[in-house]
């Protein structure tokens, strides 16, 4: 929809870990529901169904008020868990193995909040999480260069 009250992020609007804000459509939503679905910095969105089930996105910034589509799951975490650390976990084999084991295999594979809540996530102290994130961010450009060869 080209006009409406508020932008609604869909999984198809997320490419290369960025929201393509120009493609995000507007939607109409009642005032009482906006706060429930409003995106905030450090939220993590998960695709709950289809070919992208399990794909995740860390919301680093929300340049304008936006909500998330119903086929996404939004999660928020305590201050004892780095959202960047959790995002890297969601790119790990351990995450994908657990997700596949908890995904309902139908014509359209899907998972739900319970699948995510039941996952075992290694959670070191916050300072260690930050060191892990810094190290991964340091070596990622090198890994990307090597995989392009």
Each model region followed by its residue ranges:
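Sequence-specific dsDNA recognition surfaces
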Residues: 12-41, 61
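Amphipathic alpha-helical coiled-coil/heptad-repeat segments
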Residues: 98, 115-149
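Short Ser/Thr-interspersed hydrophobic loop/turn segments at strand-loop and sheet-helix junctions
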Residues: 7-17, 38-55, 69-73, 77, ...
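Short amphipathic beta-strand starts and helix->beta connectors
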Residues: 58-59, 101-105
């Amino acid at each position: 929809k080209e006009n409406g009250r508020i932008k609604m992020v869909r999984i198809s609007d997320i490419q290369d870990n960025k929201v393509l804000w120009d493609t995000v459509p507007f939607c109409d939503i009642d005032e009482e529901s906006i706060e429930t679905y409003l995106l905030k910095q450090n939220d993590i969105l998960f695709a709950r169904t289809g070919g992208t089930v399990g794909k995740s996105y860390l919301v680093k910034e929300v340049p304008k008020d936006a909500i998330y589509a119903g086929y996404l799951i939004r999660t928020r975490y305590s201050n004892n868990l780095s959202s960047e650390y959790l995002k890297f976990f969601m790119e790990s084999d351990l995450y994908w193995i657990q997700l596949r084991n908890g995904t309902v295999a139908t014509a359209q594979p899907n998972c739900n909040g319970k699948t995510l809540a039941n996952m075992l996530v290694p959670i070191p102290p916050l300072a260690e999480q930050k060191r892990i994130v810094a190290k991964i961010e340091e070596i990622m450009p090198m890994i990307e260069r090597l995989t392009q060869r």
